Amino acid sequence: MQQFKALLLKEWRESVRSFKILWIPLVFVLLGISDPLMNYFMEDILQAVGNMPDGFMMTMPEFQPADLLIASTGQFQTIGLLVLITAYIGSVSRERQNGTATLLYVRPMSFTALFFSKWIVASIIAIISAMAGYAGSMYYTVLLYGTVDLAKFLAMLCTYCIWLMFVMALTVAMSAAFQTSVAAAVTIILIPVGLLVDTLIGSFWNVTPWKLAKYGTGLLTDNVLMENYWYTLLVVLILIVVIVGIGIKMSKKNIRYLKV
């Protein structure tokens, strides 16, 4: 336990020292507030820009509060996930490549503690970022469009946090299994590309990890079959356990990549 606490503190200090605790949440805040503000002021922006043909008229769609939160989730699912993957894809492999891990591996060490420390800190940063992003989106949504059911919003937020734990578990596990460039390629294929594929042809199946965030937003509008939601949530939780186990095993197995 003492070793785990020391490793956890090390990872946390590294995230603070590299300002990940600051700039990643800031990115999510900017993504979160962009949709409510842009959609609300779009007509004014178009008028200010000018150069519109005479007689040109544009009817702006009327958004419901839930629509803006769903749009913000879409931003998090694209740009936000790429930022998180980029920030933590080298959490294990980069230490092996630059020799930093030598300071850890020269003494008896629990690879379980090592992996958990990296995954937990990455998940905490991801969850803080999502909460900050949704807070910004919620603030301007309520201010400009109307209220949102708080219980449904919290259910969606908790669901998205579990999804982020899955994403960060996969990211750190890929970093443990491969060298940085390969890990990045595999993770990007599995997460963002997987989401794209699920969006295009996902109507053929109802239960996949990539649908969890979508089902979470469906809680806002009561537009989700709860049976599919619970099965998907269960699949994601099981996969988290499996991926963490694989990550721990690969962390130990790939000591051979260590550069002294």
Where in this protein do the model-derived segments appear?
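Aromatic- and glycine-rich beta-strand/loop motifs that create alpha-glucan
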Residues: 1-28, 256-257
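Residues that define the loop-to-transmembrane-helix transition and helix capping
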Residues: 22, 112, 181-182
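Central hydrophobic cores of alpha-helical transmembrane segments
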Residues: 24-29, 183-195, 211
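Helix-loop-helix units of permease transmembrane domains in multi-pass membrane transporters
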Residues: 91-123
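Transmembrane helix-loop junction
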Residues: 14, 94, 107, 138, ...
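Short hydrophobic, aromatic-rich alpha-helical segments embedded in or entering the lipid bilayer
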Residues: 203-223
